[in-house]
From Swiss-Prot:
InterPro entries: Ribosomal_Su5_D2-typ_SF, Ribsml_uS5_D2-typ_fold_subgr, RNase_P, RNase_P_CS. One of its GO terms (cellular component) is ribonuclease P complex. One of its GO terms (molecular function) is tRNA binding. This is Ribonuclease P protein component. NCBIfam families: rnpA (TIGR00188). It is an enzyme of class 3 (hydrolase). Consists of a catalytic RNA component (M1 or rnpB) and a protein subunit. The gene is rnpA. Belongs to the RnpA family. RNaseP catalyzes the removal of the 5'-leader sequence from pre-tRNA to produce the mature 5'-terminus. It can also cleave other RNA substrates such as 4.5S RNA. The protein component plays an auxiliary but essential role in vivo by binding to the 5'-leader sequence and broadening the substrate specificity of the ribozyme. Keywords: Endonuclease, Hydrolase, Nuclease, RNA-binding, tRNA processing. It catalyses: Endonucleolytic cleavage of RNA, removing 5'-extranucleotides from tRNA precursor. Its EC number is 3.1.26.5. GO terms for biological process: tRNA 5'-leader removal.
Amino acid sequence: MRRYLLPRQLRIRRRVEFTACYERGRRYHTEHFLVFVLPRACPGLRARTGMAVSRKVGKAVVRNRVKRLLREFYRLHREELPVEADIVTVAKKHAGEAALDYARVAAELLPLLRRMARHLPGSSALDGLP
């Protein structure tokens, strides 16, 4: 059986990498998420993603659901992510209270991908989109 996971090499896992995105990355806001984007120095590498969902969002069930929705979004749209960038998505406090589903997450983050593509050099498939 084939597993459809976001590969480990496309995830940000170390605290130092998260901190670098927070401190030096460009910020983008949506209603439920704060996204930090940091261009990477090594050319030719794929975009990596990381998620941070604090306990302020809700209990473990709620936090895990938000993380699953974010992972699924980035897994399905990884070809459209800006290349050579680290992307950290932080769930805002009220993200757990909202009735988030995949369609709502995609509706919030897809326009953000287009904005990122305009600001980062070497962006991928979204370059030509309005």
